[in-house]
Amino acid sequence: MYLARDIELGIFRAVKELPIRNKREAGLFRLLNHPSLPQMIDYTERDEYCYIIMEYIQGKTLEQYLEEGYVFSIEEILHIGKVILQVFEYLHSRKPAIYYGDLKPSNLMMTEQKRLYMVDFGSAVFSYNASYKETKGTRGYAAPEQFQGTISAASDFYALGKTLERLCGRKKIPYLFQCPALGKFILKCCRSEQT
């Protein structure tokens, strides 16, 4: 990922460099328009690489916040969960549906204004490619079936449960007493029978 400056407009853009064989990410990303997803601005190919030029999100990943010792409040965790559910509703209701495939704190960016963005669509697939062998996800967040080479909406929800659990961190037990519905939701997301 590179940071570039648009000389004509005087604004920064993020530029993602990919091997040309991975250009399906650009084709999929080009179709998306949601307030919690970075906007794709342009696409170009050169030699063995393709470049996705997109909106620059100035902020940090949720993983960076965790590494810095930040403790998310229960309200922040519930808000993050709500935003992710809205993005999943948008992706899963498309025709054909899109499965994100790699939800985790390092793929979620938050601006200083607390606006959340889901980034990195490298593992996303259309539902008709649900047995796409390259979509493995990240250990600790990916649903068990992803390691068998299949993915579904339930796989995304499994990763959501694991992500929310990680955001609770050391406060997990007090948070689950404070908001039992959150605990039930996390358990429901991570039940292996649904995946």
Residue ranges and their predicted role:
Residues 47-61:
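Conserved short submotifs of the Hanks-type protein kinase catalytic core
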Residues 2-20:
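ATP-binding glycine-rich loop module of kinase domains
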